[in-house]
Amino acid sequence: MILLKRMRDDIKMVFEQDPAARSTLEVITTYAGLHAVWSHLIAHKLYNQKKYVAARAISQISRFFTGIEIHPGAKIGKRLFIDHGMGVVIGETCTIGDNVTIYQGVTLGGTGKERGKRHPDIGDNVLIAAGAKVLGNIKINSNVNIGANSVVLQSVPSYSTVVGIPGHIVKQDGVRVGKTFDHRHLPDPIYEQIKHLERQLEKTRNGEIQDDYII
């Protein structure tokens, strides 16, 4: 009964978060994120029973069919909604709270080869937009929004909005921090580096830089 209630809650979460959802049958049969979460429930139970090979086998089969990789050791709360889902990776020591929404291409990963706790903790009511990377043993507190393609390497307080590379807070407790910011103005480090090199080359042509190489 507990499992059935959880599955009903997961389906309800899909309808709340995705306006494209039309029917319960459609959600159950076609939503890969839902399939990945339900497969993880089985894999995680086996993992806790120290049946590691069976747990990993289920997680890998799920990844093959859904494109979503959730390590069986990860601890996931209620009503996790993974939308689109392709390319999502959730690491072994990651914990995720309740009512969390994750979009495609998100990585909740580590930063190196260290053992032990090495993945992020995600609080309740968190939204992580497409392509974002949350890395390391950090805490993303409750009611946080993380913008698309952001790279978050430090803990984030509750009621914050984070964007950019590296991620920085642009809104906290409903108040903007610094200048107005939206996804159209996300920093592009590659473009900035190219512009820097162009400026250096221009200085070389004008005789302002005499060295044979540019740093």
Curated annotation (Swiss-Prot):
Catalytic activity: L-serine + acetyl-CoA = O-acetyl-L-serine + CoA
Main subcellular localisation: cytoplasm
Compartments where located: Cytoplasm
E.C. number: 2.3.1.30
SUPFAM superfamilies noted in UniProt: Trimeric LpxA-like enzymes
UniProt keywords, alphabetically: Acyltransferase, Amino-acid biosynthesis, Cysteine biosynthesis, Cytoplasm, Repeat, Transferase
Keyword Acyltransferase: yes
Top class in the EC scheme: transferase
Pathway annotation from the record: Amino-acid biosynthesis; L-cysteine biosynthesis; L-cysteine from L-serine: step 1/2
Entry's Gene Ontology BP terms: cysteine biosynthetic process from serine
Amino-acid biosynthesis listed as a keyword: yes
Annotated Gene Ontology cellular component terms: cytoplasm
Family membership: Belongs to the transferase hexapeptide repeat family.
NCBIfam families documented for this protein: cysE, EPS_EpsC
Protein name: Serine acetyltransferase
Organismal lineage: Bacteria, Bacillati, Bacillota, Bacilli, Bacillales
